[in-house]
């Protein structure tokens, strides 16, 4: 073999080695990023899950002791919201503005899943005519991730009740409307409605806009209502709102088994890891075969 041929083979080997090293580094970085994304998705899901807060849930047995512990951790905690037949079973907070708890948990820690919070313009004791609450739509059925399901009439009809714990007392919730609107709807998202005529007009607006309603729930301008608002999964600027009447009587929870929260953002990643690994191993085998061919030709 003459000198030019040897130089060519050495050059090919050097280029091959450089390419192999570069591609391997890229693959390792992608795998590292995938592992981090998997861990991060798990953290978001864990922070959003209602089970994280179960130990703080106020009950008749503990007379709110555990709830008071959560309030000691974060004084902005003011209530507990439960919607029967769903995973909506969370403490509720109120900040100085409506941005405070978009990325902050009920424990006051940074969290992409945020917290369920009452509009800063509302009275903290829920004494207003309309009390507006917000929460993220999570695909894992966490936070307000199940609100959109109330657009289905059978789902809406099956889940009529909930309860609200505030100032050491429990109130019943009777859901009577599901509304879809836009984030900029000033009529729906206004508070401090004092005049009786304005209150009735507000109720009429809700019923006119509602996709689903419950005729057996009588709501008047004298009542108090609560709106559970979240982002619509079908529209960037859309908002899905479940509306309930706040009452003195508390209905029992007819649901013994609630559909479990499932983190869809995590599971597909796990499912794809074997395929990714198979592709990586295939590439390595291919590069090894190529290197052997070069050596044989040498």
Give each language-model segment a name.
Residues 21, 31-298:
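Solvent-exposed, non-transmembrane regions of membrane-associated and secreted proteins
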Residues 1-16:
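N-terminal Lys/Arg-rich, disordered targeting/topogenic segments
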Residues 13-28:
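Sec-dependent N-terminal signal peptides
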């Amino acid at each position: 073999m003459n000198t030019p041929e040897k130089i060519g083979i050495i050059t090919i080997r050097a280029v091959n080695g450089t390419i192999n090293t570069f591609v391997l580094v890229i693959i390792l970085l992608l795998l590292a990023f995938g592992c981090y994304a998997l861990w991060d998705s798990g953290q978001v899901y864990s922070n959003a899950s209602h089970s994280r807060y179960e130990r703080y849930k106020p009950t008749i047995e503990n007379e709110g002791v555990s709830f008071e512990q959560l309030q000691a951790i974060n004084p902005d905690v003011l209530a507990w919201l439960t919607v029967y037949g769903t995973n909506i079973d969370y403490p509720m907070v109120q900040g100085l503005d409506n941005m405070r708890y978009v990325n902050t948990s009920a424990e006051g820690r940074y969290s992409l899943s945020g917290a369920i919070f009452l509009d800063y313009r509302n009275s903290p004791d829920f004494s207003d005519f309309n009390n507006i609450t917000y929460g993220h739509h999570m695909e894992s059925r966490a936070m307000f991730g199940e609100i959109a399901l109330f657009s289905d009439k059978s789902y809406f009809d099956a889940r009529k009740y909930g309860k609200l714990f505030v100032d050491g007392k429990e109130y019943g919730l009777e859901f009577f409307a599901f509304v879809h609107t836009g984030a900029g709807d000033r009529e729906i998202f206004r508070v401090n409605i004092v005049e009786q005529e304005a209150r009735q007009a507000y109720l009429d607006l809700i019923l006119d806009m509602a996709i689903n309603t419950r005729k057996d729930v009588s709501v008047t301008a004298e009542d108090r209502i609560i709106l559970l608002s979240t982002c619509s999964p079908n529209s960037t600027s859309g908002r899905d709102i479940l509306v309930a009447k706040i009452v003195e009587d508390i209905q029992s929870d007819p649901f013994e088994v609630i559909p479990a929260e499932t983190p869809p953002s995590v599971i597909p990643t796990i499912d794809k890891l074997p395929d990714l690994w198979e592709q990586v191993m295939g590439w390595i085998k291919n590069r090894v075969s190529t290197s052997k061919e070069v050596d044989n030709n040498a």
